Structures are given as structure tokens and as C-alpha cells.
Amino acid sequence: MKLKSKPKRSFGLLAAFIIAAMVGQTATAQENLPTGREAVEIQGGVYPASYFPNTEILGTDELRITALGTGMPNQTKMAVSISFFVELGNGDKFLFDIGTGSTGNLFSLRPDFSKVDKVFFSHLHVDHVGDFMGLHVGGWLSGRYDPLRIFGPSGATPELGTKAYVENMKKAYAWDLQTREGALPDAGAKLDVTEFDYMQDNEIVYQENGVTIRSWPAIHSLDGSVSYSLEWNGLKYVFGGDTYPNKWYVKHAAGADLASHEAFLPPKALATYFGWDLGQATYVSTRIHTEPAAFGKVMSAVKPRHALGYHSVLSPENYQAIVEGVRTTYDGPLTLARDLIVINVTKDYIVVRDASVDDYALPPSVTKAYVKAPRSDDKSPSDKVNAGKWDGYTPPAMPDKPTDN
């Protein structure tokens, strides 16, 4: 893909080196951008300093995690709400949460949306599911011709669970869906919801194509929050969602290749950021979330190959406060995630760098299957509304429909 505007977040070799030194990764990013940005398979752990979407072929034993959103409910331009995009060398793609604002970063990667059809909710706070509608409709517009599959926990009562959330949201944008039927593949409008017991302990919620995803309870606000692990081809990624430090995460994340867990602002920094009194900030940071020193204790117990913290706004002062807190209790490999950070994981390497994306990324090309997928009749306004069309304008003739090759 030829970039049409100055790419953002391309910090070059120096930034890649700084990240490598900070986290203690086993391979450093090198300035060897593939010629012409053609898709190539990386050899010997020598990666370009920045990740350019669709220029690298994942190895058969490689996964790539992109942080689409790492911030707070009050999103900023540089830190939208929580979402992680996981791509495997077998072609499978998974979303863990889809918080408000995160779809913009997803679409900037220009993935094959026919394969972006699975999203796993950790819980139903808006900063974790707020872009659900955008994912459903935007992915449908961009190449998904099958139902969007949603996996998520039950709640303490039926109306607080994932199934009720999805059903109610679909009712809320029923008008939108009906206007697009006919122009877009019919099946892409559908939603396939799998709700599971939030208290199940490391049980399988998804198992297909050699991929196993398990869930266990998280402790956050109300009953109905979970964490996940994804295992494939001898690699393990863990997504914590939002949670107070808990025994389930420590047990089931143990030894993960990449363990992600919130590293929330410490109380004083949180009080300053929101203008709260210290009591309120302390309660939120240390009773509902996981503050940095507690994150460090969790990671010291889990001992992952690499620890990934998120759920903050990494202004210089906040970044310093979080790092200092974590390093009082954990001295292992660490990255504090910012939006569009990319982590490649193999059995030999873990490489951390930034994505370089176009501010005006075009939608990805769609597959032939998408073009040929069944569609119902186009929708239009009623006769009484159409009667109001202005006779001062005549639209151009419709082109002939393309023929199958």
C-alpha cells in the first residue's frame, strides 16, 4: 500500500532500541523496511523498526498483538479505550474488547475483515465494548460477509450479561442495519453470541483451528468480569481485562509468553489527573483496579516471558509514576502499552515496536466471496417520502452490473 500522507507513529530505530532496552526483549528491531513494502516473512528475528500494516507475513509459529486502545473511558487522541488485536500465523484473527475509539486504529491497519469476525468481551463497561456497533457495521462494510461472533460472560442476572447487551444494542441500531441490507451481504448483519458462566474457572470458551481460548473470573465493580488466555502452537497470550489482583490470574497466566494486565494510575497520580480527592482515587486505583506496585507483584508471581501493562494515559508524569511503582515489585521484561504498539511473539523472539499507519487509510480490498455473497433487495424510503424528491435534479443512469469472470 502506498501511503498518501505522512505516516504517524514512525519513530525509527532509536525508539525501537529504547523500547528494546527498556523491556529486555530477545530481539531488537532493525531499520530494514522491506523494499517497496511488499509482504515478506521476517527472518532471524530482524524486524523493521516500525510495523507497516500488510508488509509482513506472520510465520507459522508466530503471533502478533496490536494494542488498538490502552487508555481510559475519557479517551484522548493518543489513548483511546481498551482493545487488543491478535493475529496468528495460521490466518486467524481475534479481538479482545473493543472499547470506545478503538475501531479507528483497527481500520488503520487495513486487515482482511472477512477474518475479523470474533470479539471477546472481558466485561461490559463502555471503555471495553463502546465501539461494538462500529465494529459490527464497519466490518460489514469492509469485507465481513459472515455473522460477527461475540463471546462474553454472563452477569449476576440475565439482563446484566453479554447476550442481553448485544440484543439490546442491536435493537438500538435496527434502523441502521435495515438501511444497509441489500447493498451489503445479508449474513454480515447477523450476530452470533456465545455467553458463558463468568465464574467458570479456566474452562474453554473457544476451540477451533488449533486455537484454545479459556476464561476465568476477574474482580471488578460487579460480578460478570473475566480474563482470557489464548493458546496456539505452543504460545500463550493472556488478556486480563479489568481486575483487582486475583488468584485466578496468578494461577492461569503463569508462564505465559505475553501476559497483559492493567497497570492503573497510582492513587496520587489518579487524583491529580481527574481532580478527585485522594480517598476516591485510592478506592478506584486499589480496590476496583490494579495499581502499579500490585501489577508488579502479580507479574513477579506469574513470571511471563514479557509483561504488558495498560489502562492509563501515558503522559510523561503518569508514565514515570507507573514505571516507578511497577519496578518496586517486578524487575522482569516490561512494556507499558500505548496505542498502536505492536508485539511479535515466537518461541525465540519477542519484539516490541510501533505501527506506522496512514492518517487517511483507505478501506481494505474485499474478497470475491464478499462480492458474491447473497444480498436481499435494496431498501428505499416510502412512496410518501419519495414524493418529495426535487424535480430540479435528475441522477445519472445506473451503470451495468458487472458480470462474473
Predicted regions and their residues:
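Cap/insert and terminal regions of metallo-dependent hydrolase folds
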Residues: Q30-E31, S227, N233-K236, Y244-I341
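Bacterial N-terminal signal peptides
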Residues: G12-M22
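Bacterial N-terminal signal peptides that target proteins for export
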Residues: K2-L14
